[in-house]
Structure formats: C-alpha cells, structure tokens
C-alpha cells in the first residue's frame, strides 16, 4: 500500500474508534427533543389543520396518517412541500417559552385564547352600572368562564384595547361569546409577537387558514415592554389548567 494511503487509512481507523460510539448512542440517552425529531421529524403533520392542504397534498396527508408502507414517504413529501426553508424542528420549538401551547389540540388553544377575552370584558364591566346588563353578562358565560372571570375580575392590566360597547349589546349570549373570542384572539396574537418566527409559523398552521391570516394581521408590537410582558403572563395564566 502506498505510504500516503496507509497513513490515511490509519487516520480513518483511529477517528472511527471515537466516532462510532457517538453514532451508536441510544435515543433514550439523547435530549428528548432530538430523540423525538429523529424518530419522527414530521410529527407536526399530526397537528396540521387540513385547510392548508389541497389536491395531492390532501391525499399525501391521508396516507401519512395511515399505517401504509408509503406512510414515511408521504409524510416526508408533504412536509417538504409546506414548510419554509428556515423552520426549526417542531420538538425544538416546543421547548421555547410559550411553545407548550403547540402540543395541544386546537380546541384547547381556542378555549385558552377565549379566556383572554375575559380580560377585556372585566375592564369594560367596571364601567357599567346597569344591573340588567351585568346580570345578562353573568348569564351568558359558561361555568368555566365564570370561574376564570372571577379570578381576574379585579386584576390590573396595563393595556386596554377599547370599549366593548356593552351598553348597545342585544343581550344574546352568542353575540357576547363572539366578542369575547375576537378580543381574546387579539390579546393572544399580540402576546406572541416577540416569539420566534418558527413558533408563530407552527401556531398558524395549527389553526385554519382564515384564523392564521387574522393572527398574522393582529400579531403586532404593542411598543410597551411592561404591557408586552403582562400580555404573556395573561396567556400563561389563561392556559393554566388547560395545558
């Protein structure tokens, strides 16, 4: 063997004695986020709202949810077709501040941001003196909403997004619930403004396309550090017990 090839072989053999153990490292010895990503790098597809899928992608999604031998190929192809180039792995984003929101069903996320709308309701209710309106508000809330409302009713918040105009409310529970959801979604979107772009991308794709577009338009800077911090604390408190 030529000396230079012998030297190269010796170097390769020497290095592989150090590399091989690392390659054989068991998944359970790795950080959970890395191990989960290696096991299934396309796990977010289980959470993806189907409004993002069309034609071939919808068929790929159906195969990806099955036990078909084509499952891995379908998930890989679908994932590469929808994800932006710079997106971080889903498992990594779950470990970010606020990231745990992403690992729960979309109905739980909706319930969480609807709770946030009760902060707006509490602010407006302090300005109302008409007993009939206050009674109608109480009658329109679910038991969970009543309990949460009671816990934050007198809690100060440094940011006010304006009146709900409850004096002109028709006293229909469905009307109030719609307002609460819209206001809560606004707080939710603004609270997540400082979050990593990957987290916001995953959240938007957890929601349907219309909700995602609304989130994108509402996710703006409140330009007040104290208010921004409080909004994030409100999100954490609203989701507590749901997550």
Q: In which residue ranges do the predicted regions lie?
A:
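General marker for long, soluble alpha-helical cores
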Residues: 1-243
């Amino acid at each position: 063997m030529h000396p230079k090839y012998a030297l190269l072989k010796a170097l390769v053999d020497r290095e592989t004695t150090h590399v091989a153990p690392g390659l054989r490292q068991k998944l359970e010895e790795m950080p959970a986020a890395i191990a989960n990503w290696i096991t299934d790098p396309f796990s977010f597809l289980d959470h993806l709202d189907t409004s993002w899928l069309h034609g071939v992608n919808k068929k790929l999604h159906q195969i990806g949810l099955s036990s078909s031998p084509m499952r891995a190929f379908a998930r890989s192809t679908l994932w590469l077709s929808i994800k932006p180039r710079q997106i971080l792995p889903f498992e990594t984003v779950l470990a970010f501040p606020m990231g745990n929101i992403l690992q729960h069903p979309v109905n739980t996320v909706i319930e969480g941001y609807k709770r946030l709308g009760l902060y707006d309701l509490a602010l407006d209710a302090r300005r109302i003196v008409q007993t009939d309106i206050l009674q109608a508000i109480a009658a329109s809330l679910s038991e969970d909403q009543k309990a949460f409302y009671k816990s934050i009713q007198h809690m100060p918040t440094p940011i006010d997004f304006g009146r709900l105009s409850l004096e002109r409310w028709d006293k229909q529970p469905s009307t109030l619930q719609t307002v609460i959801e819209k206001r809560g979604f606004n707080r939710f979107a603004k609270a997540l403004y400082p979050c990593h772009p990957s987290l916001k991308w995953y959240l938007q794709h957890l929601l349907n396309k219309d909700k995602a577009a609304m989130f994108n338009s509402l996710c703006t800077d409140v330009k007040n550090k104290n208010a921004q911090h409080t909004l994030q604390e409100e999100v954490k408190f609203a989701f507590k017990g749901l997550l």
